[in-house]
Amino acid sequence: MSLSDKELFELNKKAVTEGFKIKPRINYNTVGGVNGPLVILDNVKFPRYNEIVNLTLPDGSVRQGQVLEVRGTKAIVQVFEGTSGIDVKKTRVEFTGENLKIPVSEDMLGRIFDGSGRPIDKGPKIFAEDYLDINGSPINPYARIYPEEMISTGVSAIDTMNSIARGQKIPIFSASGLPHNEIAAQICRQAGLVRPTKDVHDGHEENFSIVFAAMGVNLETSRFFKQDFEENGSLERTTLFLNLANDPTIERIITPRLALTTAEFLAYQTERHVLTILTDMSSYADALREVSAAREEVPGRRGYPGYMYTDLSTIYERAGRVEGRNGSITQVPILTMPNDDITHPIPDLTGYITEGQIFIDRQLHNRGIYPPINVLPSLSRLMKSAIGEGMTRKDHGDVSNQLYAKYAIGKDAAAMKAVVGEEALSTEDKLSLEFLEKFEKNFISQGAYENRSIFESLDLAWSLLRIYPKELLNRISPKILEELYGRDREQDDDEDEDEEDPDKSGDKLIDA
């Protein structure tokens, strides 16, 4: 039986390529133009969306890009390292046939990388345990576990009143000139689990890791983070990704995805509890706007693309816990609100996706209070599942509610005092003013290197609430009030007596 030429060709092709997984790649010299961070390619065959492209420049240097759009035989590629120096006639382009992947390993802990995932700490390259797609894999909603157990940050205003659950995503809303970098560094230094519960098999400190990604930061901020982590020893459990302000803007689009892919490997394959901090998401959104403008897309609010909500969700929704895995990813993105405007599209859309917010206040900062966290507009929607008996303390929820109520009343009393004067205030209003002053001075304010446990913060909260008579503490259950209010009052009296008479020694009651 004779075979046709076509059949013979197919048999020869199969014999030659059998056992080979690598397909031949085609190089193109068909760069049609350059527009901002984008390169337009002509006459290319079968380009794929999100495919990685290698561009070889005339000087021999190689840059990576990603296919953003395909129109027939044309492809639009965003170049991560920028398009300066790309010669339209002499640049060669190679399609790899793969999505962008990052080599991951436990050895990434203690290392510093640039915004594209290359080591910049003079250490060796990562010996990869696996190569993972930076876009991640969608998690089956049915496989997700509700976030529980509290992560302690050592900051009273966060731990007591806006507790963060393991697996939660909660942003920090800041503004230009406010100390969000210092707060982020403090959280990295001090973060850890409060106490392991029955499903946390391994709660020791080595099992808690941090992935930190900075986008568009200046050299001074970059040096601050590197030096701070190295000096206090937290670098050993931290992986840093640093995209500087003078790095290509387009690189900021992949930096948070590299960080989250690393976090997913540490959480779901090595079963660690990972805290992921992303700063500054406003720089990321600006990079998104730049690409959108270069593609001449119809702009949305303030010039940002209409798909920014969807794009942000592909980052924020990669936090959480998964059934059958002990690890978790808790996300704390930080964003600066342009002109302190909370209605700006970036904080507005972020607030829809995430589970609360921590609000950094300029007025508190101007009065010298650090950290300047305004607890009234702050919120943690999953706090109820992270606190209480067995996780923190049984009085945690009631104390938090009472602090919120009394702080709001104190703010109203301060506004009234500005109008009618202190003489016209009632006794309760004067107590509220005293509470307001001590709450901001002693509770919210703390040192940058002061690490308060949740139990110390709750004890401090009780000492402030004792300014009021028991009858005015109406947000705390009578049972808890009866158990803790009187005993704390006696302890305070003992401490006052000891201050008056240093030689006097007596037994002190231990706080619950």
Curated annotation (Swiss-Prot):
Coiled-coil annotated spans: none
Biased composition annotated in UniProt, kind: Basic and acidic residues: 503-512
Alphabetic keyword roster: ATP-binding, Autophagy, Hydrogen ion transport, Ion transport, Membrane, Nucleotide-binding, Transport, Vacuole, Virulence
Residues where ATP binds: R381
One Pfam match: ATP-synt_ab
Cellular compartments annotated: Vacuole membrane
Site (Required for activity): S378
Membrane topology: Peripheral membrane protein
Annotated spans, Disordered: 484-512
Composition skew (Acidic residues), residue ranges: 491-502
Gene3D superfamilies xref list: 3.40.50.12240
Null allele phenotype: Results in the inability to grow at alcaline pH and altered resistance to calcium, osmotic stress, cold temperature, antifungal drugs and growth on non-fermentable carbon sources. Leads also to unability to fully assemble the V-ATPase at the vacuolar membrane and impairs its proton transport and ATPase activities. Finally, leads to autophagy defect and avirulence in a Caenorhabditis elegans infection model.
CDD domains in the cross-refs: ATP-synt_V_A-type_beta_C (cd18112), ATP-synt_V_A-type_beta_N (cd18118), V_A-ATPase_B (cd01135)
Top-level taxon of origin: Eukaryota
Family membership noted in the UniProt record: Belongs to the ATPase alpha/beta chains family.
Protein name: V-type proton ATPase subunit B
Species of origin: Candida albicans (strain SC5314 / ATCC MYA-2876)
